[in-house]
Amino acid sequence: NYNGNPITLGEILQDESEVPEKYFLTDQAKLEKFQYLRGPKKIERTSSDGHQYIYSEGGMSPYDDLNLPGRTMLTSEGTVNRSTHLLFVNNKYRLITPIEAERLQDFPDDWTAKKKLSNGSIVEVSDKMRMFFMGNALVTEIVKEIGYFIRKVEVE
């Protein structure tokens, strides 16, 4: 029984002045691709044995609602696909940044920014890999709450 308040997508956003330009979508073809991917579809397909069927997929909102909690993040976050978080902020479309991805999963800012190599040197992690890390992560607050519950059950 979780009694806390959910964190909305709008609450985890960086100030627009801190968001690098590469996260803003200005390419019309990319925006149209997102529109298609997030829209409803009925596509005739043929299986490997020749059986024809209709693949159907319901539509999603054109962009993520900033007043709702973020959806589940996948390792493909940040690429052009149906599951990527697409934001519409101040009349501009954009993707979430690695810091926002960390916040969405309840990690500290820049948690994934650097890594230690086997030779001991510290190197920067690419934004793509940072998004992959967060798509592969569990929301830390949820894990913590599960741990508290298990401890409580063991004590009783």
Question: What do these predicted ranges mean?
Answer:
Residues 1-156:
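C-terminal target-recognition/interaction regions appended to catalytic cores
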